[in-house]
Amino acid sequence: MIWKRHLTLDELNATSLNTMVAHLAIVYTRLGDDVLEAEMPVDARTHQPFGLLHGGASAALAETLGSMAGYLMTRDGQCVVGTELNATHHRAVSQGKVRGVCQPLHLGRQSQSWEIVIFDEQGRRCCTCRLGTAVMG
């Protein structure tokens, strides 16, 4: 397991209370050896005006996952801040849920890079994101 902090899924989800993460109904669903996953509904909260998943909602899911994964890689007295987010949208989603899967690309002392892939309920890749974070403290 790569994580330096050891939190349960319940503890991870508790960090979302009264935040945009809760408003978008993003829920952490899996913490594996080197992977963090979350789900987000595709509904009125996350739609753009034409009834499809908003690209900004996908970006919010990606940044949520990458930032939390980055935090899990820090020690006491440290935190991470996002420095860059890139998202490539591959497929539209109009309903159901999407699942984000976050894995590290680079884990340095001062910077991290994360890949977040978003899948629809049929397991099709809908969006590929890369998040850069800086380690503070």
UniProtKB/Swiss-Prot annotation:
It is found in: Cytoplasm. The keyword Glycosyltransferase does not apply. SUPFAM superfamilies: Thioesterase/thiol ester dehydrase-isomerase. Pathway: Siderophore biosynthesis; enterobactin biosynthesis. GO terms for cellular component: cytosol. GO terms for biological process: enterobactin biosynthetic process. InterPro entries: HotDog_dom_sf, PAAI_dom, Thioesterase_EntH, Thioestr_dom. It comes from the Bacteria. Pfam families: 4HBT. Its EC number is 3.1.2.-. Keywords: Cytoplasm, Hydrolase. GO terms for molecular function: 1,4-dihydroxy-2-naphthoyl-CoA thioesterase activity. The active site is at E63 (nucleophile or proton acceptor). Homotetramer. Dimer of dimers. Interacts specifically with the aryl carrier protein (ArCP) domain of EntB. Required for optimal enterobactin synthesis. Acts as a proofreading enzyme that prevents EntB misacylation by hydrolyzing the thioester bound existing between EntB and wrongly charged molecules. PANTHER family: 1,4-DIHYDROXY-2-NAPHTHOYL-COA THIOESTERASE 1, PROOFREADING THIOESTERASE ENTH. Belongs to the thioesterase PaaI family. This is Proofreading thioesterase EntH. It comes from Citrobacter koseri (strain ATCC BAA-895 / CDC 4225-83 / SGSC4696).
